[in-house]
């Protein structure tokens, strides 16, 4: 670390000591949510850090009011637990107070929530072309190379796929440090990701540091330019347009702000996804509001680029819109949700995904976890040919894997009915609407040889 960086860090610490963050947790003023107020000295990226803390605790942010103009950061969040109730767990409340309050150091401890601790494991980051059977193929390669997958998250969007996997050696249960072995793992996985006829580059990165999985997946897909529109030959492109988020960008010239508004279906971690992307694109949120009404979410941000300027051109405007749309859609869980809970064993992920592939199912998103010798995996699957999933197919898969081990969270008939039902729009209401006058507000095929 350079002398100038040391001086910057000491200056930041001095500012925090002079202006310590203040956190107020209120369970009385709102009937349906816990209200969390955060006041602190303002610094770049602090909004994302706070939202990341709350999101990683599996809290749902139903409303938010953001103000960080000048040197002070003042935010209010209405949050609920996973069941839609106020947060009453004293352990969680104490953690919020310590993580966001005077004891917190935003540059270090706050990032420990939701982070993969990789001291005794190896983290593999993968980016490549999505296709039927990809997850099955990747996990088969890792099993062949005597690697166990402890935790993993896989996203697919717009013909691209990204994964962050935490692996260990089968025999030792520890991370893999042999350079030659790591090089072989990287090369074989890269060959799988390349496929046979894709011009796009495939990337594999191996590390031993701590990784915040969701943060990295957004960064990886952003760097891979998954937001760029691609031609699709089937009817999925029509359905994709129907589900497209409504994102608008307008300049408020009097105040040199760009006003970004987002309207889309509400879901967990939505605020994190949009704020994460704005931060990665180097935009600073000065004011904003977030509101949910029924199944819809409304977000409004008053932003400038980190250089102090609003959006400068039509091309930049379209890029902001495309990137926010991609950030929202990456985590949209398309397909049938399957949950697997069983005793963990070597090759489990490879075997399960092989069964999916053999039954013509493709994994659109997956979350793999191991805890206390148990495998807790969630898969979102769809028919590789684009048809509705036959209930008989699911029954057959469950019989093969185990009826009590693999459970269906939403059946194909219910899924199809929801897709056919029209969405009901609600009027947008924003906190700063009266104060600021703006103009408007895959597919996964088994390659037999991976070497």
Swiss-Prot record:
Residues 35-118, 123-200, 259-335, 337-416 form the ACT domain. One of its GO terms (cellular component) is plasmodesma. Residues 410-420 have a biased composition (Polar residues). Keywords: Repeat. Highly expressed in flowers and at lower levels in leaves and siliques. SUPFAM superfamilies: ACT-like. Pfam families: ACT (PF01842), ACT_6 (PF13740), ACT_ACR9_3rd (PF24931). Residues 409-428 are annotated as: Disordered. Transmembrane segments: none annotated. Gene3D superfamilies: 3.30.70.260. May bind amino acids. This is ACT domain-containing protein ACR4. The lineage of its organism: Eukaryota, Viridiplantae, Streptophyta, Embryophyta, Tracheophyta. The gene is ACR4.
